[in-house]
Curated annotation (Swiss-Prot):
Disulfide bond entries: C3-C31, C17-C36, C21-C38
Induction: By bacterial infection.
InterPro entries: Defensin_insect, Defensin_invertebrate/fungal, Scorpion_toxin-like_sf
Organism: Bombus pascuorum
The organism's place on the tree of life at top rank: Eukaryota
GO BP, one annotated term: killing of cells of another organism
Protein localization: Secreted
Role played: Antibacterial peptide against Gram-positive and Gram-negative bacteria and fungi.
Keywords tagged on the record: Amidation, Antibiotic, Antimicrobial, Defensin, Disulfide bond, Fungicide, Immunity, Innate immunity, Secreted
Official protein name in the record: Defensin
Keyword Disulfide bond included in the entry's annotation: yes
Keyword presence, Secreted: yes
Gene3D superfamilies tied to this protein: Knottin, scorpion toxin-like (3.30.30.10)
Pfam families cross-referenced by the UniProt entry: Defensin_2
Length: 51
């Protein structure tokens, strides 16, 4: 839904998708063909890997 609603905005759609994925505990995401795809990696896993 995030990608479809903001598809006219371009970059904004990816930011909204990433924010939506972050809110679900994932480490971001991107829009692809109007569908928001979240990363499989969780934010905690990414954080632990970096620090």
């Amino acid at each position: 839904v995030t990608c479809d609603l903001l598809s006219i905005k371009g970059v904004a759609e990816h930011s909204a998708c990433a924010a939506n994925c972050l809110s679900m505990g994932k480490a971001g995401g991107r829009c692809e063909n109007g569908i928001c795809l979240c990363r499989k990696t969780t934010f905690k896993e990414l954080w632990d890997k970096r620090f």
